[in-house]
Amino acid sequence: MLTLFGNKRPSKSAGKDEGPLVSLAKHNGSVEVSKPWSSSDEKLALTKAMDASKGKILLNIEGTSSFGTYESDSIIESEGYDLSARMIVDTNHHISNWKNDLFVGNGKQNANKVIKICPTWDSRKQYMMISRIVIWVCPTIPNPTGKLVVALIDPNMPSGKQVILKGQGTITDPICFVFYLNWSIPKMNNTPENCCQLHLMCSQEYKKGVSFGSVMYSWTKEFGDSPRADKDKCMVIPLNRAIRARSQAFIEACKLIIPKCNSEKQIKKQLKELSSNLERSVEEEEEGISDSVAQLSFDEI
């Protein structure tokens, strides 16, 4: 044993890195050194396993996050509503750019909006899976009071069965809807007439044809040769108006959904674009809406 280790005396720095030796064992003609298994070893092994998988995983594991301050009080969101932790993204998937749209008033009647999710088919695979859809709704008027419902729709079902997933909230403050699902679509169904849709309805009373809110949405898609068809859930995340672009948790959440926008300046510019399309015509808003519209209603809270 002295001959084996005589020329390999560890330095002081190496001893700190290796930690205390526990035992020596001979296995298959070689000598193995065992040492205690620490939490750092477990984290390192997990990181290596994630890096070795197909695609890379972006993960926020900091627990609770500070979203900013309002007057003298800190706003702390629990881990259950940590945006960064919720929005784990497999970078092997295709992430769409943010689409900007408007919510326009309809007088004293409910305002309705239809968004068609028809992604570009840029693969030779047989199926495209929509795995996450994120919708941000931000009021652009003072003191909004309207209730809001957002539903994921299959327009090919009978009108009474078109709602696949639904979430509800208010536009008193900015609000985010995150649809988690596994919905595989064959290429022949990826048309404006047959693709999945988002239907939004708001009870805010506002002058007909005038915008009272901005809608921003994005999705992830994944191509494959085998289909999957599972509905999961819709998560509703209300956001306090105290959130600012300089909030670290908010910046990290935006990084995960918008990989091309990594600096605070870019994210501020992205958020500023929430209200940049106020000159969109009502004719374009109403264009292409078919007669087969899902019947939405507000649930009692």
From Swiss-Prot:
Residues 284-288 are annotated as: Essential for long-distance movement. Keywords: Host cell junction, Host-virus interaction, Transport, Viral movement protein. It comes from Tomato spotted wilt virus (strain Brazilian Br-01) (TSWV). Its main location: host cell. The keyword Transport applies. InterPro entries: Bunya_NSM, MPV. GO terms for biological process: transport of virus in host, cell to cell. Oligomerizes to form tubule structures through host plasmodesma. Interacts with host A.thaliana At4g26020 protein, which is involved in intra- and inter-cellular trafficking. It comes from the Viruses. Residues 19-159, 209-283 are annotated as: Essential for tubule formation and cell-to-cell movement. This is Movement protein. One of its GO terms (cellular component) is host cell plasmodesma. Viral movemement protein which is responsible for cell-to cell spread of viral genome. Increases the size exclusion limit (SEL) of plasmodesmata by forming tubules structures, thereby allowing viral ribonucleocapsids to spread directly to neighboring cells. Coiled coil: none annotated. It is found in: Host cell junction, Host plasmodesma. Pfam families: 3A. Residues 1-22, 282-301 are annotated as: Disordered. Belongs to the tospovirus movement protein family.
